[in-house]
Amino acid sequence: MRRHDIIIKLLLLMCLLLSRFVTRECQEVHFKIGPAKIIAKPNNARVMPTWGEEKKWHKHPSGPNPTGNRHPPVKH
C-alpha cells in the first residue's frame, strides 16, 4: 500500500508541474455581429435548385469494344 501512495503522489506532483508549462492564455473572440441587413433581391436560386436545372449525362455502354483492344495486357 505504501508503494501505491508514493506512485499516486508522484503522478499528482508531475501533473502539477507540467500544468504550469502546458497552460495557454485564452484570447477574446470578436464576432462580426451587426444589425440585420435587408436584401432587395434574395438569392434563393443557389440555395434550392429546381429540377429543371439537372443535366442529363450520356452513359456509355459497358460492353466489349467492337474495334478490339488497343492496349492488350502484356504476357510474361
UniProtKB/Swiss-Prot annotation:
Disulphide-bonded residues: none
Keywords: Developmental protein, Differentiation, Glycoprotein, Hydroxylation, Secreted, Signal
Gene Ontology biological process terms from the UniProt entry: cell-cell signaling involved in cell fate commitment
Region annotated Disordered, chain positions: 53-76
Sugar-bearing residue positions: 64
GO cellular component, one term: extracellular region
Signal peptide as annotated in the record: 1-26
Residues recorded as bearing Hydroxyproline in the entry: 61, 64
Superkingdom of this protein's organism: Eukaryota
Similarity comment: family membership: Belongs to the CLV3/ESR signal peptide family.
Record-given protein name: CLAVATA3/ESR (CLE)-related protein 46
Taxonomic classification: Eukaryota, Viridiplantae, Streptophyta, Embryophyta, Tracheophyta
